[in-house]
Amino acid sequence: DANPYLIAELIEAGLNRREARWLLEEFGADDHESLAALRRAAQRRLAGEPLQYVIGHWPFRSLDLDLDPRVLIPRPETEELVGVALAELAGADVTVPVIVDLGCGSGAVGLALLAELAERGVVASLVALDQSPDALAVARQNALKHGLHAVSFVRSSWFEALDPSLRGRVDLVVANPPYVGAEEFASLDPVLGYEPLGALVALDTAATPGFADLEAIIGESLAWLAPGGRLVCEHGHMQREAVLNAARAAGFVDVADLDDMAGWPRILVARRP
């Protein structure tokens, strides 16, 4: 270890070795100031604040995203969502894709798509929507950080404020909306209390807890998609039947639902005929 005495001090305070190393790497201990910052960061982590917020940035696929409590911490499952979306776009054979990222949060999904498409020589344009001005500020910051300019940010509740001229012209709608029901949220890890509640918890529908936002997105997406356009959407592990039924009822074809790496139902894929 770079500084075994400090690592030992942090572990004794209650951090695990991995977190101690991360914090030391991030804040350093070269002088009195950085040492004080390191100890403050350790206190925040020991108080229960997620490491991603304490450090202030976190890797997501090929990006290093700035993160703070204004936005949700992107999950590993959401990295898989990006992979599925890329595969769908490749299958759609679109030369200059128009992508809409609903509820963009930190910008993770849409910006990762732009970056990885650019690596493949594909020039895409992105519209990133979120109803939270705070989230949009973080997403803008992340776009600037990574030099991703083919993106417009719009404050919008789902499709509400999307430019009407895009109706029927979008190649990919991608979304990681709130999908946790209030009852389930109450039973989850209290550390989630640090994250923005509105990005996690959704209203229940008559049949399915936490399904209200997904229902709205699936129902409204078809009209915005171009013929052959794809909807790729993350959802909760108890919502497979609900998302499949909603997508078929909305008029989608090639409707499928994929498991995540842990084997849970997680990603809806559907195509506009």
Say what each PLM segment does.
Residues 23, 48, 78, 109, ...:
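Residue-level signal for inorganic ion chemistry
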Residues 208-270:
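Conserved Class I SAM-dependent methyltransferase catalytic core
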Residues 18-88:
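Conserved AdoMet
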Residues 64, 125, 150-152, 253-256:
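Conserved beta-strand segments of alpha/beta enzyme cores
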Residues 80-186, 216:
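Conserved SAM/SAH cofactor-binding pocket of Class I
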Residues 113, 191, 217-221:
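Class I S-adenosylmethionine-dependent transferase superfamily signal
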Residues 1-17:
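Non-catalytic nucleic-acid substrate-recognition regions in nucleic-acid-modifying enzymes
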Residues 178-213:
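Mobile active-site "lid"/loop adjacent to the S-adenosyl-L-methionine
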